[in-house]
Amino acid sequence: MLTDQSKRDALLNTHIHPTAVIHPKAELHPTVTVGPYAVIGENVKIGAQTTIGAHAVIEGPIEIGIGNRIFPSAVIGLEPQDLKYKGAASWVKIGDYNTIREFVTINRATHADEVTEIGSHNLLMAYVHVAHNCVIEDHVIIANAVALAGHVHIESRAVIGGALGVHQFVRIGRNAMLGGMSRIDRDAPPYMAVEGNPSRVRALNLIGLKRAGLTAEDLSSLKKAFRLLYRSQLTFKEALEELQALSNNQYVEYLYQFLQASTTGEKRRGPIPGKN
């Protein structure tokens, strides 16, 4: 545990602009850089090699890992925009090597000991809003002006196009690709390309899957699953039952588990349908 004097000494050794306002109880690694007029509050912990841009605001409780780049005027860790919030000591937790661009807002969770969580190696472009209790896993790209409502969960390596909105409690599957300006009001299945208002599953996200290193055999299995779910004459329930028989492939198995949970899980909104 750092003493107050050691914290003050550490602050003197960091690269902090003289106009920045740092709470004396904030914990900044000596290699942290803080730009002009940034404000860092109490109960903030920031890891090594992280940079905080000019006019950024970071309030706690929050933990930020190593190597993050937080650009000017980002606002992170303020209380949620949720009428149920009653002043609880909720959290934001951010992993390592994220890029958080200008005017991004990331709100704390609503209830005590709950967390809004950002993983590692993510890119949040300018004006992205991450509401209370959201979870963003790893290697996610979110383009400009995307708004995530509360409790949205984005799995690893999803790509979210610009200027779209995501309804509360929606889950976006791994390696999914969401087209810009779409309305995402149901769960977006993993590995799929989704677009439109209302949004529909259009195709497999083949480019993203190839970049992720899936084999030709994996892609063939997912193509069969896609045709079964979105191009057959079966009802969705019937197609899901047939899909279970194909789930000897790990990616098809995950797709099946995701869709099953989407239709039966608590507070689930169901999966986005196909274009037909």
Curated annotation (Swiss-Prot):
Keyword Repeat part of the UniProt annotation: yes
Single Gene Ontology BP annotation: lipid A biosynthetic process
Enzyme class of the recorded protein, top EC level: transferase
Molecular function, one GO term: acyl-[acyl-carrier-protein]-UDP-N-acetylglucosamine O-acyltransferase activity
Record InterPro entries: Acetyltransf_C, Acetyltransf_C_sf, Hexapep, Hexapep_transf_CS, Lipid_A_LpxA, Trimer_LpxA-like_sf
Pathway per the UniProt entry: Glycolipid biosynthesis; lipid IV(A) biosynthesis; lipid IV(A) from (3R)-3-hydroxytetradecanoyl-[acyl-carrier-protein] and UDP-N-acetyl-alpha-D-glucosamine: step 1/6
GO CC list: carboxysome; cytoplasm; membrane
Catalysed reactions listed for this entry: a (3R)-hydroxyacyl-[ACP] + UDP-N-acetyl-alpha-D-glucosamine = a UDP-3-O-[(3R)-3-hydroxyacyl]-N-acetyl-alpha-D-glucosamine + holo-[ACP]
EC number from the UniProt entry: 2.3.1.129
UniProt subcellular location: Cytoplasm
Extent of the signal sequence: none
Keyword terms of this UniProt record: Acyltransferase, Cytoplasm, Lipid A biosynthesis, Lipid biosynthesis, Lipid metabolism, Repeat, Transferase
Highest taxon of source: Bacteria
Cysteines paired by S-S bonds: none
Family as reported in the entry's similarity comment: Belongs to the transferase hexapeptide repeat family. LpxA subfamily.
Reported function: Involved in the biosynthesis of lipid A, a phosphorylated glycolipid that anchors the lipopolysaccharide to the outer membrane of the cell.
Oligomeric form and interacting partners: Homotrimer.
Stated name of the protein: Acyl-[acyl-carrier-protein]--UDP-N-acetylglucosamine O-acyltransferase
Organism of derivation: Rippkaea orientalis (strain PCC 8801 / RF-1)
